[in-house]
Amino acid sequence: MNIGQASKASGVSTKMIRYYDEIGLVRPASRTGSNYREYDDRQVNELRFIKRARGLGFAVAEIQHLLSLWRDRARPSREVKAIAERHLADLDARIAEMQAMADTLRRLSDCCAGDDRPDCPILEDLTGKRETV
């Protein structure tokens, strides 16, 4: 199948498929005489794998490692689990950071009258003149 058909079958844009080819993540099964990329079911499954992994927030390097493990039928599942648990710990840390930011912004917003007066604790905090609430 051509790149457009592979895109439709996998749900991955043609632009991203070309990018994944460039970085060596997924190679076309073959090339036509006119040098067009051709894909088969294996690459479509790999593209779906990548799309799902990206949707879970894995970085390209992690996806490359996961793909190599997926392709290796003799892989130890503990290695896959370790990658997933590291990623989960990173996600938990980012969520905690974002929650702290949201809590701070919520407190600052609660302190702002939001009326016609010019004084605003949000702007004061952003300039560093006000200690974070």
Residue ranges of predicted features:
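Append "Primarily bacterial transcriptional regulators
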Residues: A6-S7, I17-Y20, Y39
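Glycine-centered, phosphate/nucleic-acid-interacting loop/turn motifs that mediate DNA/RNA or nucleotide
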Residues: G24
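Arg/Lys-rich, alpha-helical DNA-contact motif
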Residues: N2-K8, R27-G33, D41-V133
